[in-house]
């Protein structure tokens, strides 16, 4: 599995701000979108372009455009919505697919409860966004769902990732690509990433 920890100074600075215990909902939300935008920049660096001729201000001009690559942005409810606007800044024509996953309290297994996928998803590259890759359960379940629908090109964008989640994702789906602002130390006993960001969903939506 291709794993990219984005070591750009802007990414590291913004993520450092997000780790503050007393950060406001407004600021956390802004930074989640900003890092989402920067991760998208990295994740789309290998898109193929083609030369086309357009009418410029002084006549015909040859320019480069992305070659026929259809994209869908896939936020995992609910926290993934906090990164979506930042991703769309770079790929504004992308279709949006939404997936909801909950954890069964008895089996502790992730269970998809909602999905609304873009049309022709089998022809699209999916940018799957969620702030955290902790155990990897929700991410793996979502990728299972996307592949079942025919989507075979999937890139995962997360703010922070735990080694345990990375290992689980690589075992289940070695063909996906992972882009993260940080590979953190570990999971604690409650399944939170350390040092992590706390509960990203609560911080984005201002809930507890």
From Swiss-Prot:
The record's Pfam families line, in alphabetical order, gives: UPRTase
SUPFAM superfamilies noted in UniProt:
PRTase-like
Q: Name one GO biological process term.
A: UMP salvage
Enzyme class, first EC level, given as a word: transferase
Note how many cofactor molecules are bound and how. Binds 1 Mg(2+) ion per subunit. The magnesium is bound as Mg-PRPP.
| InterPro entries assigned to the protein according to its UniProt record, in alphabetical order | PRibTrfase_dom, PRTase-like, Upp_B, UPRTase/APRTase, Ura_phspho_trans
What does the record give as cofactor?
A: Mg(2+)
Domain of life per record: Bacteria
Listed pathway(s)? Pyrimidine metabolism; UMP biosynthesis via salvage pathway; UMP from uracil: step 1/1
Its UniProt entry gives the catalysed reaction(s) as: UMP + diphosphate = 5-phospho-alpha-D-ribose 1-diphosphate + uracil
E.C. code: 2.4.2.9
Chain positions recorded as 5-phospho-alpha-D-ribose 1-diphosphate binding sites: 78, 103, 130-138, 199
Cited Gene3D superfamilies: 3.40.50.2020
Does Glycosyltransferase appear among the keywords?
yes
**A Gene Ontology molecular-function term?**
GTP binding
Q: What range does the record give for the signal peptide?
A: none
Q: How is its activity regulated?
A: Allosterically activated by GTP.
| Residues that bind uracil | 193, 198-200
- Keyword terms, alphabetized: Allosteric enzyme, Glycosyltransferase, GTP-binding, Magnesium, Nucleotide-binding, Transferase
Database matches in NCBIfam families: PRK00129.1, upp
Q: Which protein family is named in the record?
A: Belongs to the UPRTase family.
User: What does the record give as the function of this protein?
Assistant: Catalyzes the conversion of uracil and 5-phospho-alpha-D-ribose 1-diphosphate (PRPP) to UMP and diphosphate.
| Stored PANTHER family | ADENINE PHOSPHORIBOSYLTRANSFERASE, URACIL PHOSPHORIBOSYLTRANSFERASE, CHLOROPLASTIC
Q: What is this protein called?
A: Uracil phosphoribosyltransferase
Name of the gene this protein is made from: upp
């Amino acid at each position: 599995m291709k794993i990219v920890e984005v070591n750009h100074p802007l990414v590291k600075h913004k993520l450092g701000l997000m780790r503050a215990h007393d950060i406001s909902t407004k600021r956390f939300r802004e930074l989640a979108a900003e890092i989402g935008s920067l991760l998208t920049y990295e994740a789309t660096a290998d898109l193929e372009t083609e030369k086309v001729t357009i009418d410029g201000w002084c006549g015909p001009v040859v320019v480069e455009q992305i070659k026929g690559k259809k994209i869908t942005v896939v936020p995992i409810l609910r926290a993934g919505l906090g990164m979506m606007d930042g991703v769309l800044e770079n790929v504004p024509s992308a279709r949006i697919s939404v997936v909801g996953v909950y954890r069964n309290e008895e089996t502790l297994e992730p269970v998809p409860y909602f999905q609304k996928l873009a049309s022709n998803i089998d022809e699209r590259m999916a940018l799957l966004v969620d702030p955290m890759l902790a155990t990897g359960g929700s991410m793996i379940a979502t990728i299972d769902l996307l592949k079942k629908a025919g989507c075979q090109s999937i890139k995962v964008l997360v703010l922070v990732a735990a080694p345990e989640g990375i290992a689980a994702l690589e075992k289940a789906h070695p063909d996906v690509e992972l882009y993260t602002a940080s590979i953190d130390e570990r999971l604690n006993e409650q399944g939170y990433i350390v040092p992590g960001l706390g509960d990203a969903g609560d911080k984005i939506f201002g809930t507890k």
